[in-house]
Amino acid sequence: MQPHHPKVLIVDDDPVHLEIYGLLMKQAGYEALLTLAKFSGAEIPKNEYIGLVLLDFRLNSVKTAPQYAQEIRSLYPSVPIIVLSDLWALPADIAPFVSGFVRKGEPAKLLETVSRFFAAPAAKSEKSPSFS
């Protein structure tokens, strides 16, 4: 059974950014699932109904954002991944794995982008396969 509110997975190495983006998503009516990408890495949740992923590009973690994007893509093949960054454009090394790019510090643009992906006809939450 899918959740009532679309679920957004947020991956960032900064706990403050996680809380800010989580609050922003909750205020917009989405359920936020926060994942801290620590230096030692982050455990991407499995067996969750994920509708969209927000992924920070500059991570102080053992894995890079493109590596996390590949992992997320393998778990949730059709779920959109939006990169968040203070860079001016989407970096080429992550482009093949993601669906969009939003500069940090633009909450209205972020909400517009998230809303657009959830409004798309093919948009649905996807649950990763069970791992035993």
Residue ranges of model-derived segments:
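Non-catalytic signal-transmission and effector/linker regions of two-component phosphorelay proteins
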Residues: 1-9, 15, 106-132
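Acidic, metal-coordinating helix/loop segments flanking the phosphotransfer/catalytic sites
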Residues: 9, 33-52
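Two-component/phosphorelay signaling modules centered on CheY-like receiver
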Residues: 15-33
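Conserved phosphotransfer cores of two-component systems
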Residues: 46-48, 71-78
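Two-component signal transduction core modules
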Residues: 53, 81, 101-102
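Conserved phosphotransfer microenvironments
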Residues: 54-71
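Hydrophobic/aromatic residues positioned on beta-strands within the core alpha/beta folds
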Residues: 84-85
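As written
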Residues: 93-102, 106
